[in-house]
Amino acid sequence: MKKVLLTGMNGTVAPAIAEELRRRGCEVAPWDRGAVSPDDRQAVARFIREVKPSALVHCAMGSAQWAEDMARVCAEEGSKFLYVSSASVYGTHQQGPFTVYDTPEPSDDYGRYKFECEQRVRAANDQAIVVRIGWQIALRRGGNNMVEHLAQKQEEHGHIAASTEWFPACSLLDDTARALAGALDGAPAGLYLLDGNPGWSFWQIAVALDRAMQAGWEVRENRDFRWNNHMVDKRLGMVSVADLLTRTWAR
């Protein structure tokens, strides 16, 4: 049985990955920050060596130093290391669709942070897997996901303003978890982009989610925000958000 050490279990993505890994028969060991501080570099190294994971998946927020330290120890111990990054590394002055050959130019602190983590991870561990993901969609309320954002906008304003000129990187959370878990089963080291959006606008996605969930939202079309941060990379086999949502509302 594979043992996977997983950070970020209080977030949105890590619990979905944990569920998928357990479904595949893996043992999941959550990183408890209360027991092992990310700021204690010796404790970090000691903990990884004690757990002896076959892989470590890093989803949590934390310092770039922590990400680098974990990547380095995994390289020394022969454990796979997967860092979950973000489409936010691309600045709003850059226009997609993006491929792995497009160099990020982050325009905010979060994007700069994620890009720094990527660079330090790959410098510390040349066998690391780095995966940039987009906005996650869970077909339910709660957590940091698109449905929760849309539902809150509906509650606050009585409608949802959605641009037809914004093409966001996004994917269904469960599909993201499947792809990330699958990457541990033989994906070569390197950079990957994980995006299930086939090219839909934010307005199209919001309308489709309203229909799929029978949410009763009022989605108003506008052109106020213009950006394409869609990412293109077919290697991890993402399912189209359009296909998944169409299937959901057709049931």
Explain the meaning of each model-derived region.
Residues 7, 31, 59, 81-87, ...:
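SDR active-site strand-loop-helix element
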Residues 94-131, 138:
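Catalytic helix-loop patch of NAD(P)-dependent Rossmann-fold dehydrogenases
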Residues 2, 21, 234-251:
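Amphipathic terminal alpha-helices
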Residues 2-24:
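N-terminal Rossmann NAD(P)H-binding glycine-rich loop of SDR-like oxidoreductase domains
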Residues 158, 179-231:
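Mid/C-terminal beta-alpha module of Rossmann-like enzyme folds, strongest
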Residues 36-77, 89:
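NAD(P)H-binding glycine-rich loop region in Rossmannoid oxidoreductase-like domains
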Residues 26-35:
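Conserved glycine-rich Rossmann-like NAD(P)H-binding loop of the short-chain dehydrogenase/reductase
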Residues 119-168, 175:
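NAD(P)-dependent short-chain dehydrogenase/reductase
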